[in-house]
């Protein structure tokens, strides 16, 4: 599937434009169905976007927010994506949104993934908006090169839902939506910043194995065109 590149002068301009575009998609979903779904990613890159989006005029009570992936850590942990979203997105008007976490207080990551799969099924499919990030190793979501369940995660026949992932570069065990859960979003975004990430993207767009740079799965096989938002 083709990708569309959206280039901005700086990260601030990107954050505002992405918030406008995502807000418009959510508003359209609410107008059409009465509800909207949004899955976002962690890391430092989306903080400004989250803050901009939280200020958009929407009927946030009709929006359900979840995460593309999460570490198997409780929300009070500094490395929790849940905490990042709570601190930066679920505030101002967006405090009215419903949030469905991937982390669950279970004995194991596998048990948490099973619970999260059940709870996130309430969002319906496809998701209205998915905002992905990308690491310097070419991972997206928790699709890490060398990941324990990477082949399963990227297999389009794997059912929608949340599975576990462990990898050398991942730190804690991860919980991640499968490729099948994300690839047909109504608006599928890759948000990256900096020259380094642009170089990684160029590598990913070249020939090579998806398992080496899993973002290639989204670039090549997503049902929705990948909307790439980049700023230096």
UniProtKB/Swiss-Prot annotation:
Lineage: superkingdom: Bacteria
CDD domains: 6PGL (cd01400)
Keyword annotations: Hydrolase
Keyword check for Hydrolase: yes
GO function terms (MF aspect): 6-phosphogluconolactonase activity
Protein's pathway: Carbohydrate degradation; pentose phosphate pathway; D-ribulose 5-phosphate from D-glucose 6-phosphate (oxidative stage): step 2/3
Gene3D superfamilies, alphabetized: 3.40.50.1360
Keyword Hydrolase: yes
EC number, as in UniProt: 3.1.1.31
Catalytic activity, reaction form: 6-phospho-D-glucono-1,5-lactone + H2O = 6-phospho-D-gluconate + H(+)
Gene Ontology terms: biological process: carbohydrate metabolic process; pentose-phosphate shunt
Disulfide bonds, paired cysteine numbers: none
Family assignment from sequence similarity: Belongs to the glucosamine/galactosamine-6-phosphate isomerase family. 6-phosphogluconolactonase subfamily.
Known role: Hydrolysis of 6-phosphogluconolactone to 6-phosphogluconate.
PANTHER family per the UniProt record, alphabetical: 6-PHOSPHOGLUCONOLACTONASE (PTHR11054:SF0)
Name recorded for this polypeptide: 6-phosphogluconolactonase
Organism: Rhizobium meliloti (strain 1021) (Ensifer meliloti)
Gene that this polypeptide is encoded by: pgl
């Amino acid at each position: 599937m083709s990708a569309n590149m959206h280039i901005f002068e700086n990260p601030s301009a990107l954050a505002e434009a992405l918030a406008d575009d995502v807000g418009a998609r959510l508003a359209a979903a609410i107008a059409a169905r009465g509800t909207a779904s949004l899955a976002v990613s962690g890391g430092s890159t989306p903080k400004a976007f989250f803050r901009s989006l939280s200020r958009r005029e929407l009927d946030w009570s009709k929006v359900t927010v979840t995460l593309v992936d999460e570490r198997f850590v409780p929300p009070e942990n500094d490395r929790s994506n849940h905490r990042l979203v709570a601190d930066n997105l679920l505030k101002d008007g967006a405090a009215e949104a419903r949030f469905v976490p991937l982390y669950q207080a279970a004995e194991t990551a596998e048990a948490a993934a099973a619970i999260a799969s059940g709870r996130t099924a309430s969002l319906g499919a496809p998701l209205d908006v998915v905002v992905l990030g990308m690491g310097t190793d070419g991972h997206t979501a928790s699709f890490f090169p060398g990941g324990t369940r990477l082949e399963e995660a990227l297999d389009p026949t794997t059912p929608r839902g949340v599975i576990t992932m462990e990898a050398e570069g991942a730190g804690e065990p991860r919980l991640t939506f499968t490729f099948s859960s994300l690839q047909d979003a109504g608006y599928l975004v890759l948000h990256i910043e900096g020259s380094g990430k642009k170089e990684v993207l160029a590598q990913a767009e070249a020939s090579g194995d998806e398992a080496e740079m899993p973002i290639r799965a989204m670039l090549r096989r997503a049902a929705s065109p990948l909307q790439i938002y980049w700023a230096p």
